[in-house]
Swiss-Prot record:
One of its GO terms (biological process) is regulation of DNA repair. It is found in: Cytoplasm. Modulates RecA activity. One of its GO terms (cellular component) is cytoplasm. Keywords: Cytoplasm. Residues 28-47 are annotated as: Disordered. InterPro entries: RecX_HTH_1st, RecX_HTH_2nd, Regulatory_RecX, WH-like_DNA-bd_sf. Belongs to the RecX family. It comes from the Bacteria. Its main location: cytoplasm. It comes from Corynebacterium efficiens (strain DSM 44549 / YS-314 / AJ 12310 / JCM 11189 / NBRC 100395). This is Regulatory protein RecX.
């Protein structure tokens, strides 16, 4: 007999959530028909139901780490043991998977937001993801790809400079602005300075030609 909760390989998050909801609705229906044999079972499931509902609402917004969900649910004053039971259920249903969560977090934020490996590692650590899982997720980022990402950030920031610096002081101020954009994303200081200077000099040359 097929387990109605266990997802099939390749199912996306929305499909897995829908499958879990269907299984839970079926369980509730059987309870109402008297299939749940004891008052204790019904009371236990009722307590879990609200925790599960809150967890699914959070997962509807975006994928989350187990630790992140644990913290959010704990802040709502739910019983710790019930939270753990619900999180175990969701883990078995593959709706919580720190490995997949970390891989996707790194992939999206490195490509779309220009984040460095250092910042991504810190973000995942803050979400309670284990060091080994973080390291495997960060292996996706090739050092040369990270340099290309940093270069793109520097070029974008340098393009916001609308005039040629009047003097050295002006140039240094503009350079600090470009370096700051890289530093906020966690790129190494030496690389940030080199790329910022390169991007700013290219921007100044472009302004001179126009």
């Amino acid at each position: 007999m097929t387990d109605p909760i266990t997802p099939h390989p390749g199912e996306n998050q929305a499909a897995k959530l829908e499958k879990l909801r269907t299984a839970l609705e079926e369980f509730s229906r059987r309870q109402e028909e008297g299939a749940a044999s004891s008052l204790f079972d019904r009371e236990a499931e009722e307590k879990k139901a609200e925790v599960r509902r809150r967890a699914l609402l959070l997962l509807d917004q975006r994928a989350r780490s187990r630790s992140e969900l644990q913290g959010r649910l704990g802040a709502l004053d739910f019983d710790h043991d019930i939270i753990e039971e619900v999180l175990d259920d969701l883990t078995r249903a593959n709706l919580i998977n720190d490995e997949s969560f970390a891989q996707e977090w790194v992939r999206q934020r490195a490509q779309r937001r220009g984040k460095s490996t250092r910042v991504l590692d810190r973000e995942l650590r803050d979400k309670g993801v284990d060091a080994g899982i973080r390291a495997r997720a960060l292996e996706q980022i090739d050092p040369e790809d990270e340099r290309d990402t940093a270069r793109a950030v520097a070029v974008k920031k340098a393009r916001s400079e609308s005039r040629i610096p009047a003097d050295r002081s002006d140039y240094d101020k503009a350079l600090r602005r470009v370096v700051g954009a890289l530093a906020r994303r966690g790129f190494p200081a030496g690389m940030s300075m080199d790329l910022a200077r390169e991007a700013l000099d290219e921007r100044i040359e472009d302004l001179r030609q126009h």
